A protein has these predicted regions:
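Short hydrophobic/aromatic helix or loop-helix immediately within or flanking a transmembrane segment
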Residues: 3-37
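Transmembrane-helix signature of polytopic, membrane-embedded enzymes
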Residues: 55-75
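Multi-pass, polyprenyl lipid-linked donor-dependent membrane glycosyltransferases
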Residues: 69-70, 81-95
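Alpha-helical transmembrane segments and terminal signal-anchor/GPI-anchor hydrophobic tails
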Residues: 1-11, 26, 123-246, 280-292
């Protein structure tokens, strides 16, 4: 992010638009370049904006806001919002556009801005416009049947049949980061997807909860799992898309009554993500560390 800020300081607005990578994010930084602590002020501003937009957008979408805050804080607040600043801001903009703003034009403006800040948010936006605004259960069923065919594209990337320079760069970045952490990054995230799979199966298996499969949140959680396992050989992309889907999975869980299963699931989710946070921070506590 310091490189982004350097570009914001060095280049003019027109140069940023024409020549700099991720111009929308850099233009947001440009506003803060006039002060001595511009970079720090920008990070504080983004942190406030991200939390405000996310909390505001889901407030009327969940049954138990306390459960949402608990699940959100165990992962996103500690890891995702702190480390992946750009994608977190993009997701916040998309969420406020999809969930909270009633005006269609203004909603579309926030959604498009979010996608321009980080292209990964195109995935939930695609699902939202395909099925998320529909009450037609048949459309959801067709969507679930067709989605695995779409995943042949990321599978082709991960198997080497297709190539793209940013994917190659992501792989280099991930391998370097994982080497610095002694291989921990390769193992760290696998428990959370497994837990999400269990949660989705539980919702489908329970008759009282099965109607939730015909919701946008269930659909994007389903997509996140499929993309994660189909792109596992490109870990940065797999984890990034899955992280986005996990936010909506948390929304889905927060709509349910706090029975013993939801409580157990929430505690397991929090414990696993506290472990992941400790690993990222470099702590090696035997109770939390299950091997490298």
């Amino acid at each position: 992010y310091k490189e982004y800020y350097h570009n914001a300081v060095t280049y003019s607005v027109s140069e940023i638009i024409l020549n700099v990578q991720d111009p929308v994010f850099v233009l947001l930084m440009k506003v803060f370049t006039g002060s001595k602590y511009g970079f720090d002020n920008f990070l504080l501003f983004v942190a406030f904006l991200t939390l405000f937009f996310k909390m505001t957008s889901v407030f009327r979408r969940v049954e138990n806001i306390y459960l949402f805050v608990f699940l959100y804080s165990s992962y996103y607040l500690c890891v995702h919002d702190y480390i992946q600043v750009r994608v977190s801001l993009a997701l916040a903009l998309v969420c406020i556009g999809m969930y909270w703003i009633p005006n269609k034009k203004m909603s579309l403006f926030f959604i498009i801005t979010g996608c321009l800040v980080h292209l990964s948010t195109i995935i939930p936006v695609f699902v939202y416009y395909v099925v998320g605004r529909s009450d037609n259960n048949l459309r959801y069923k067709r969507f679930y049947y067709m989605v695995p065919l779409v995943l042949l594209i990321p599978l082709a990337f991960s198997m080497g049949f297709l190539s793209y320079y940013r994917i190659d760069r992501y792989l280099d970045y991930y391998n370097q980061a994982s080497d610095k952490k002694g291989g921990l990054l390769r193992n760290m995230p696998l428990l959370v997807p497994a837990l999400q799979v269990i949660g989705l199966i539980y919702i489908y298996a329970r008759k009282k909860l099965r109607q939730n499969i015909f919701t946008f949140e269930y659909a994007i959680s389903y997509i996140g799992i499929l993309i994660f396992y189909s792109c596992i050989s490109i870990p940065v992309i797999a984890i990034r898309i899955f992280d986005i889907s996990t936010f909506f999975f948390i929304v889905l869980i927060s709509r349910m009554k706090c029975n013993i299963y939801v409580i157990f699931f929430s505690l397991a989710f929090a414990l696993i993500n506290i472990r992941n946070t400790l690993i990222l921070l470099g702590y090696n506590i035997p109770f939390f560390h299950f091997g490298s």
